[in-house]
Amino acid sequence: MGGQKTHFGFSTVNEDEKAGKVAEVFHSVAKNYDIMNDVMSAGLHRVWKHFTINTAHLKKGDKVLDIAGGTGDLSRGWAKRVGKEGEVWLTDINSSMLTVGRDRLLNEGMILPVSLADAEKLPFPDNYFNLVSVAFGLRNMTHKDAALKEMYRVLKPGGTLLVLEFSKIYKPLEGAYDFYSFKLLPAMGRLIAKDAESYQYLAESIRMHPDQETLKQMMLDAGFDSVDYHNMSAGIVALHKGVKF
């Protein structure tokens, strides 16, 4: 696979280099990730995640896999939904992000299983989870098609995948959004996190991520049925939903 090329932001790199470069970004931003999310989105990321949690049809005792769960926002919500008899796994490929997420949950008295896991090679059995979620993580994966197939594999028949991700903003707002993404965002990263370069990558990675219809087709290709999406904040983010029958 070493000869294959892929995108790292706007740069073209070897596929076997991307994971390491993405890891460097998230090792760098982990400690400031939550405050930067609040600043960058003016708190809207909390609204997007709240909507995602309320979209899921979960009951007490269900099993949930939170992929690229980072600092644990969705895992916390899932745990409240499924109760003590349920099972929620917080996973991330980045040890720094996973440590921050685990510690945050522990500080809130919430003990959940955590796993340092690659979404393209999930360490879970077939047909195990009622719900799989991935928020703001799919765009950083090298082989998104492989990751989606793994998510399909670990879901029970009747289970649901929820993908919350930055997407294609409505066209009249593109100019203002570009100014924000490529001028203001790196400046905020420099000021708050002392790291403009990582936030430049984040802006670029959003632009390189598949748009709403393309991701919908990718989920269908991975085997999901009843795939649909809901735009939020004029398409800045979209929540995709697919079911395994």
Curated annotation (Swiss-Prot):
MF (Gene Ontology): 2-methoxy-6-polyprenyl-1,4-benzoquinol methyltransferase activity; demethylmenaquinone methyltransferase activity
Q: Which CDD domains match?
A: AdoMet_MTases
Q: A Pfam family name for this chain?
A: Ubie_methyltran
GO BP annotations listed: aerobic respiration; menaquinone biosynthetic process; methylation
Assigned EC number: 2.1.1.163, 2.1.1.201
Reaction equations catalysed: a 2-demethylmenaquinol + S-adenosyl-L-methionine = a menaquinol + S-adenosyl-L-homocysteine + H(+); a 2-methoxy-6-(all-trans-polyprenyl)benzene-1,4-diol + S-adenosyl-L-methionine = a 5-methoxy-2-methyl-3-(all-trans-polyprenyl)benzene-1,4-diol + S-adenosyl-L-homocysteine + H(+)
Per UniProt, which keywords does this protein have? Menaquinone biosynthesis, Methyltransferase, S-adenosyl-L-methionine, Transferase, Ubiquinone biosynthesis
Q: What class of enzyme is it?
A: transferase
Q: Which residues bind S-adenosyl-L-methionine?
A: T71, D92, D118, A119
InterPro entries linked to this entry: SAM-dependent_MTases_sf, UbiE/COQ5_MeTrFase, UbiE/COQ5_MeTrFase_CS
Specify whether Methyltransferase is a keyword of the entry.
yes
Top-level taxon in the UniProt lineage: Bacteria
Its transmembrane ranges are: none
Pathway the protein contributes to: Quinol/quinone metabolism; menaquinone biosynthesis; menaquinol from 1,4-dihydroxy-2-naphthoate: step 2/2; Cofactor biosynthesis; ubiquinone biosynthesis
By sequence similarity, the record places it as follows:
Belongs to the class I-like SAM-binding methyltransferase superfamily. MenG/UbiE family.
What is this protein's function? Methyltransferase required for the conversion of demethylmenaquinol (DMKH2) to menaquinol (MKH2) and the conversion of 2-polyprenyl-6-methoxy-1,4-benzoquinol (DDMQH2) to 2-polyprenyl-3-methyl-6-methoxy-1,4-benzoquinol (DMQH2).
Q: What is this protein called?
A: Ubiquinone/menaquinone biosynthesis C-methyltransferase UbiE
Species for this entry? Neisseria meningitidis serogroup A / serotype 4A (strain DSM 15465 / Z2491)
